[in-house]
Amino acid sequence: MSVILPRNRPSRPLRFDMIFHQPAAPASLAFRLRFPLAALSLAATLFASAAVAQTQPAAAVVAQEPAQSQSQSQLQPQPQPQPQPQPQPQPSVQQGQTFEEEIIPQRYANNAKIDAFIADMVARHDFDANALHALFARVSYSATAAKLVMPAPSPAVKNWRVYQSRFLDAVRVNAGVKFWRANQGTLQRASTEFGVPPEVIVGIIGVETIYGRYMGNFRTLDALTTLAFDYPNTPNRDARQATFRKNLEDFLVWTRDSQLDPTGVLGSYTGAVGIPQFLPSSIRDYAVDYDGNGHIDLRASQADAIGSVANYLKQHGWETGRPVVWNIAPDTGSQGVAQAAADGRPEPHWVLSQLLRAGLVLDEPSVNIASEASTPVTVVDLPTPGRATEYKLGLQNFYVLTRYNRSFFYALAVYQLGERVKAQMEASGALTPSPADAATGSPAAQPPSE
């Protein structure tokens, strides 16, 4: 039996208690939901930026063993608190395929784990128990979501150049220019209010969903319930289930408070929603009503998406007016120091002066070394098979980008896509270079090097 999943939420938001009058499907039936892959949002390459080329799971990036070098003994990183786990990278599905979602209806009716969850929601958030029981009786187990969160049998080989070309392609750049032109006033307002440059906001939204083109067709309630209570048997199962349980809780509170039908919200198979692909916990914590209509809609309102991304970055420590990365000189000594200090940690934990004393040289003529000597940095490694690994220094703002998705590749792709779009805006006369960009020769006026 084939069922067509609705592509959009109902045009009129429903009250939480309006959704329980439809008969549920027989419990014995299993369905396959069939979609063209493009309509499904490429199922992974585009959700949460799909950090496929990185082998580290986003929930627990493993530090790489630094290569040995004579300068290594001089490098003593400062201890830093460990960042919170983030959603795992998404596996990819090839374009042109037909995608089927396999679901099992009524899996969560008369379920002891669901009953305990409902009791908790009633006690802590004043939900109606009967309404929640009726709701979960209509929730389906998504076997597809459970399969897609499984780690690959063998880790993919990291390839920065392939990843970079995927997210800095002409489609995204041209769509970014169109998005920027259509939202120039809102982007500038967000930049002024939150201190985040328009190009960074544009870069994130472009990498995440190509400016709302691919936001996901999984029913969010099904995906979150499946992953909260039936996460696959992996080593990190308990931690992942706890994360998705919290997001399911926040999803129900958010949809109730926003008068949205929880069965009508669509998103990625990990529960990320809308143009910026926010998980429900992030929606509750960081999303803002930026078009002033009284409610937050990350799927339909580009203004809400822009303001929410800017607020997320600000709340995670974005430093206004500061760089994202610095280039490292290509000489053998500098590259050797970078290799030795590249330990996979995204938070800035080396003091710049330590690396300089070890022999690293910056390729940044406009940087005042004396005033930046105490700046904390991290070494960003960008491996490509068959080529020498590229290295950059990441500053606090680079780390903030990894808080959106814990991947070096992701953070640099966001930065470079934003710079590429900004360069095209300036070249077309739609954007005037700032005096600071013109004076320093910053990459704002030039596409990032490949």
Where are these regions (language model features)?
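Flexible, glycine-rich surface segments
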Residues: 261-377, 385-386
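C-terminal soluble interaction/assembly domains
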Residues: 328-450
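Acidic helix-start/capping segments at beta-turn-to-alpha-helix junctions
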Residues: 130-156, 205-209, 218-226, 328-335
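Bacterial N-terminal signal peptides
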Residues: 30-49
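An acidic, Gly/Ser/Thr/Pro-rich helix-cap/linker signature
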Residues: 54-182, 188-191
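Surface-exposed patches in mature extracellular/periplasmic domains of secreted proteins
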Residues: 127-136, 197-203, 262-267, 293-296, ...
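Acidic/His-rich structured neighborhood in mature extracellular/periplasmic domains
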Residues: 156-308
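N-terminal secretory signal peptides that target proteins for export/translocation
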Residues: 1-33
